[in-house]
């Protein structure tokens, strides 16, 4: 009799678990991201983090699961809009991804018209949060990057800087902010704007070498721009103390792909590479990354992970309240107050994260070593 009762109890437990699994809510989330074109490298890095977020969320939530539907926007604004519209037709409840403010802006407008939340870490142009989009959220911004780059240059005691920047919206805004801040600190600044289509940077570097004679070069652009500038600098050898860039530069991928160009180059980095995670949340991220990709994560993956996990948690809360189709995801995003791998994240009424700050890393061998600010540095 006891054996029969135990068997029945076990069967009930299994059946109950199966019923819960059968009734678990699965939500489709759209990923609009560049997987081809000029921004493919950064897009793929961000997407890796997004997929790790799904792995961790589905493993730990217990009640809801997320399914991704991904569309390559081919690094094109028009294709980004088309991607959002296609994903909306496939009944996604929200969107994560995007890279490049000029791509994200039109895509976010499309999402806003469709009533879909759009979260990103790929666009820092302040126009993204100053244009009345009620469903747009981002975890990083220009102010955090500007503070880090200017902080490094100031602490290095640099007296003169040449700022080389792309004429795209986000890069122009950041470059102008950097210029104004450094001039206010008494640093001599010369700026050189370039068209995004340019590939030969030797004329610009020649001006830096012969006319500016600056001690330092600050690059504000994207991966392909950095590679072109660094190649030109390697050929012409201007007498500079250092060269730094912002996003998409201080990554192990760049070190692996361009080992001749990266030594001693500075770039923004949330964490050093490799990194030892000590918190449960950090370990869950690292373990998920190792499982899916069998490699160490970089900051692009960290950003993609953080933005997406916050979104998935907001979706889950809205689902619990039955408000998914009533604007609940946006409402829950606005209530976000979470300690994450990039620090505390909250969203102000415009969808911006006022707590965001960056750090500066330097390529040293196969490592990315944090060198600014001093309290976060793990090397010199």
Report the location of each language-model feature.
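Extracytoplasmic "Venus flytrap"
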Residues: 30-51, 71-78, 99-102, 164-172, ...
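Extracellular/periplasmic Venus flytrap/periplasmic-binding protein
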Residues: 82, 126-127, 133-236, 274-284
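Beta-alpha junction/loop-to-helix N-cap segments that form part of ligand/metal-binding clefts
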Residues: 26, 42-46, 56-130, 195-201, ...
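Extracellular/periplasmic periplasmic-binding protein-like sensory domains
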Residues: 230-305, 319, 373-378
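Short, solvent-exposed amphipathic alpha-helices that sit
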Residues: 42-59, 79, 145-148, 169-187, ...
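C-terminal segment of classical bacterial N-terminal signal peptides
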Residues: 14-22
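Segments of small-molecule ligand-sensing domains
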Residues: 291-301, 312-368
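Periplasmic-binding protein-like
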Residues: 87-99, 119-121, 162-165, 212-223, ...
């Amino acid at each position: 009799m006891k054996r029969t009762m135990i068997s029945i109890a076990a069967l009930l437990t299994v059946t109950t678990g199966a019923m819960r699994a059968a009734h678990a809510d699965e939500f489709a989330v759209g990923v609009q991201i560049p997987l081809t074109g000029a921004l493919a490298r950064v897009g793929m890095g961000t997407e890796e983090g997004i997929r790790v977020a799904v792995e961790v969320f589905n493993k730990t939530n217990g009640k809801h699961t997320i399914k991704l539907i991904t569309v390559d926007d081919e690094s094109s604004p028009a294709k980004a809009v088309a991607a959002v519209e296609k994903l909306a037709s496939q009944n996604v409840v929200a969107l994560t991804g995007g890279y490049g403010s000029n791509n994200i802006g039109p895509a976010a407008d499309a999402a806003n018209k469709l009533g879909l939340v759009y979260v990103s870490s790929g666009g820092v142009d302040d126009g993204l949060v100053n244009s009345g989009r009620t469903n747009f959220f981002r975890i990083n911004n220009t102010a955090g990057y500007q503070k880090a780059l200017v902080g490094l240059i100031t602490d290095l005691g640099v007296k003169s800087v040449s700022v080389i920047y792309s004429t795209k919206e986000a890069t122009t805004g950041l470059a102008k902010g950097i210029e104004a801040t450094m001039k206010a600190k008494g640093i001599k600044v010369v700026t050189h704007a370039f068209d995004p289509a340019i590939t030969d940077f030797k004329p610009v570097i020649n001006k830096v070498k012969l006319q500016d004679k600056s001690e330092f070069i600050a690059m504000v652009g994207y991966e392909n721009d950095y590679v072109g500038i660094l190649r030109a600098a390697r050929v012409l050898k201007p007498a500079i103390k250092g060269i730094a860039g912002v996003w998409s530069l201080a990554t192990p991928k760049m070190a692996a792909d361009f080992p001749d160009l990266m030594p001693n180059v500075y770039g923004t980095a949330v964490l050093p590479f490799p990194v030892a995670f000590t918190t449960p949340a950090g370990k869950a991220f690292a373990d998920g990354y190792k499982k899916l990709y069998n490699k160490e994560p970089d900051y692009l993956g960290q950003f993609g992970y953080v933005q997406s996990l916050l979104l998935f948690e907001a979706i889950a809360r809205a689902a619990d309240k039955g408000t998914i189709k009533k604007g609940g995801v946006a409402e829950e995003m606005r209530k976000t107050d979470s300690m994450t791998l990039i620090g505390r994240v909250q969203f102000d009424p415009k969808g911006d994260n006022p707590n965001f700050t960056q750090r500066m890393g330097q390529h040293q061998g196969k490592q990315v070593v944090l060198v600014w600010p001093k309290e976060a540095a793990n090397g010199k």
